[in-house]
């Protein structure tokens, strides 16, 4: 009788563990994709470039619609400061930053060219790093029962990179036409060929669309 009770207790424990695991996996699958935006890098040579304003524009665009979890720019800057960095560069740094912010992806955007006078020129490059298999089985009984392990000894998660880049030159007829088409659905930014702020947001939109197209499960 005692043996039967022990077996039943073990079975109940296993079922409870499996139930918790399934519930956790369902919760994780329902969570929106998290993307943190690093401060935009100015590689254009233009000294008057406003990096914080550019970063805010990228964050605002990604957060629009609510389908993604996008930490505020000041929170990302604070996390980088805590790490002693101006931006994350190596896979290990990107992994640490993603952990600190609770996201799966880190987006780095650079301006490669910038002319703030009409006809505007904005060159942008973006790299979206996504972590893969950070923890394949969070309730692995072997790992759960193991003695504590130094986190620093754990290998960094594999990173997959998605890249996109383009120079948006308003002198190009196709680019100018596309900017006008974009403006028709943007309240408050209806003059991208006359206002640099609107033109930069147009360029950011098109860059992010290209990046998300290369990552089908992202959505935006």
Residue ranges and their predicted role:
Residues 46, 113-120:
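Solvent-exposed loop/turn segments connecting transmembrane beta-strands
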Residues 20-31, 117-121, 132-220:
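C-terminal/domain-edge helix-coil "capping" segments
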Residues 1-4:
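N-terminal secretory signal peptides that target proteins for export/translocation
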Residues 45-110, 154, 204-215:
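N-terminal segment of the mature soluble domain
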Residues 31-34, 66, 102-107, 120-125:
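Envelope-exposed proteins and targeting segments
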Residues 7-18:
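Bacterial N-terminal signal peptides
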Residues 32-44, 74-79, 182-187:
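Acidic/histidine-rich, surface-exposed loop or edge segments in extracytoplasmic proteins
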Residues 40-43, 75-76, 111-114, 125-134, ...:
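Solvent-exposed coil/turn segments that connect beta secondary-structure elements
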């Amino acid at each position: 009788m005692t043996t039967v009770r022990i077996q039943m207790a073990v079975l109940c424990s296993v079922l409870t563990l499996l139930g918790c695991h399934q519930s956790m996996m369902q919760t994780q699958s329902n969570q929106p994709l998290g993307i943190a935006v690093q401060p935009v890098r100015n590689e254009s040579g233009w000294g008057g470039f406003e990096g914080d304003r550019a970063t805010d524009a990228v964050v605002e665009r990604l957060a629009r619609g609510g389908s993604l979890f996008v930490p505020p720019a000041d929170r990302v800057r604070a996390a980088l400061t805590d790490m002693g960095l101006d931006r994350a560069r190596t896979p290990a740094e990107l992994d640490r930053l993603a952990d600190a912010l609770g996201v799966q992806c880190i987006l780095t955007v650079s301006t490669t060219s910038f002319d703030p006078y009409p006809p505007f020129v904005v060159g942008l490059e973006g790299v979206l790093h996504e972590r893969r298999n950070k923890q394949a089985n969070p309730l692995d009984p072997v790992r759960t029962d193991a003695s504590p392990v130094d986190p620093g000894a754990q290998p960094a998660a594999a990173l997959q990179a998605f890249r996109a880049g383009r120079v948006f030159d308003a002198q190009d007829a196709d680019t100018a036409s596309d900017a006008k088409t974009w403006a028709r659905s943007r309240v408050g930014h209806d003059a991208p060929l006359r206002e640099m702020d609107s033109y930069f947001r147009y360029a950011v939109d098109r860059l992010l669309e290209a990046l998300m197209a290369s990552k089908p499960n992202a959505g935006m």
